[in-house]
Amino acid sequence: MSDSSENQKATPYAISWNELATPDTKGAIRFYTELFGWKTEKFPMPGKDYTMFKLGDRTFGGVMEPMQPGSPPCWLNYVSVPDLGGTLEKAKKLGAKVCLDVTKIGEAGEIAILQDPQGAMIGLHSC
């Protein structure tokens, strides 16, 4: 998640990031760059390779290997929230399960991942 561009301020409670988890990151990068003309940029993360997708000056997503080995490839949307801890607590009260508690992602802020009561995954990103 990039916060390097002044014109990329996140809108609270809007989807602000899209992340692809796949064991074949090279194949996915090749597919999406050829299909849509997206550009890529490496983003340093401890212990993981992370590649961000860009279109023009806008960075909007990334690709990495799944956090859980053996997980099927999938896209995950992140919603920007001004109070990550408070939003997680509210989500739990509404029946969500926290899959990844608040985690710092370098200079790009903090994230968390939850499963909604219907079973769908959603990411949260501090804004």
Model-derived segments and their meaning:
Residues 1-29, 74-77, 125-127:
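N-terminal beta-strand motif that seeds the catalytic metal site of vicinal oxygen chelate
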Residues 17, 35, 50, 76, ...:
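Residue-level detection of beta-strand scaffold positions
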Residues 24-25, 54-56, 78-121:
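Vicinal oxygen chelate
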Residues 37-43, 97-102:
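Short secondary-structure junctions
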